[in-house]
Amino acid sequence: DSKMKEINDLKDKKLGTISIGDSETQNKALTDIEKDLGSKPVTISYSSYKKYGDDLYNGNVDAILVNEGSRGMFEEEHSDFNKKTRVIKEYRYETKSKALAKGVDVTEDPFNVYITGIDTYGTISTVSRSDVNMIATVNPKTHQILLTSIPRDYYVPQPCQGGQTDKLTHTGIFGVDCTVETVENYFGIDINYYVRVNFSSVENIVNALGGITVNNPVAFTASDGTYSYEAGDVYMDGSKALRFARERYNLGGGDRDRGKNQMRVITGIINKAISPSIITNYTSILDAVSGSFQTNMSNNEMTSLIKMQINDMSGWDIEQISVNGTGNASAWSPANGFNSWVMEPNVNTVKRAVEVMKKVENGEDVKALAQQVMEENTADE
């Protein structure tokens, strides 16, 4: 019912702004709004997404300024936000990522890759919450990969929020630089590279590979009813793999089990990507998925790694572990501006994970140890 149809309708009206998150981009938008209106907008600042949305609904402000990366924050408190609101003007800004890469010879030296998945479809450049958080520790000499899953709600200090503690997923709102730096600091490790994907990326990559096979330990049906997954090896196209990786409500371990399934999808992607029929045709595959992901690994580094595999063609041992913690339903979330459910880290599981990473880097076989760590974590759940 709002009379706000275009940006000029905002003249002399009240515009809500938020004091949480990316203030630099918000200030750029306010400058551009002033140019469009010919005068400074009347602004009211908020420190809580709930109050921000409430006042828009109640008519206490005529419009609010929303970073698309934080749209999900509104949906947590206002499930009908997308239906009840409209966009009257969109401003786009590009920000260069920091030079995060700590380059190594990827065919000789071990390295860590941070895999971050944001909770959106469409263009990969969109900033949003980091819902998939995983460290891949790779040793190219021993052909061993360790995947370490970190829960999205892990409650950790975040440099992009002035060192305040918040859910790991919220680092994605500030960009991949923040996510990587947060994990490096908390785990005490170097992350050499990152790979950033979204929902569309997963579908595109899996489909470009001709589908993948995923080992599913427990049969379940997706909570939205779209797919049923039998126990055992399951062939999946992009849509089915994405739904498998996103499901948590119909899994006994909730978000913990979702993290394990995400690692199973990554394992399926890696195994298919290094298969002879795919890797020998790598240029067409890379062309097919171009624009589906972001990474700071150079083309030369990726090509060197691929050519090493083509010359060798030996298999890779991919192990999976995760870190754990305890749920807290009322911890302060600076990004939300209210108390939220978080996972308080079990520091011992973090130390254990780093121990396994170091062994992979040192060329040790960690198959038995990784299985032991997963069993220890399962016992703590």
Regions found by a protein language model. Give the residues of each.
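Non-catalytic, solvent-exposed segments at the cell envelope interface
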Residues: 6-7, 11, 16-21, 27, ...
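Gram-positive cell-envelope targeting signals
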Residues: 1-4
